[in-house]
């Protein structure tokens, strides 16, 4: 049997990921104009894959395309932020309720282990962000609804545009950890209603801190 030929990752997808990380790291600031010519020269590519990459980021809400003006890094308004957090609260609390009711003991132990890692990262903001996101995404994987997963992934990309503000509030990391403990306690008790409530409260408090 002949070997299967795998198509390498498209160039525009690689460029999209590079730009995505620069946006998340604030190298490309919210509201800033994206200089296509400069970036194309920097990456040693033509403007075609760069424009395709920008289209991808536009569909994710990270970039805003303006007629005859080009691409700009999206600025998240208070309304945008409230809408994103509202949807995430609905989607992720629903997933959390499913996990509380249906997860295996091994899966709950895995989430508990991630929570322990979160506790250790309290003094390291970036590490806390990383483990926090891992916990939320693993919970979604266990809930096992690929349509919900895709919606959450896109919403979380927009949320990252404002994520640094969410933990700048004094004591917010400790508050977030306490909220995670409440979620974890409800999960381990297999109390779906309490888990849903705890996750919704987590996002409500997160929005208040980020606004």
Predicted regions and their residues:
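Short linear motifs at protein or domain termini
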Residues: 1-101, 106, 211
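C-terminal all-alpha effector/ligand-binding and dimerization domain
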Residues: 7-8, 112-119, 157, 164-211
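Short loop-to-helix capping motifs
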Residues: 36, 145-146, 190-191
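Hydrophobic packing residues in well-ordered alpha-helices of helical domains and bundles
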Residues: 84, 111, 128, 132, ...
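Hydrophobic, amphipathic alpha-helical faces that serve as interaction scaffolds
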Residues: 87-103, 133-170, 206-209
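Amphipathic alpha-helical dimerization/coiled-coil segments
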Residues: 94-119, 125-127
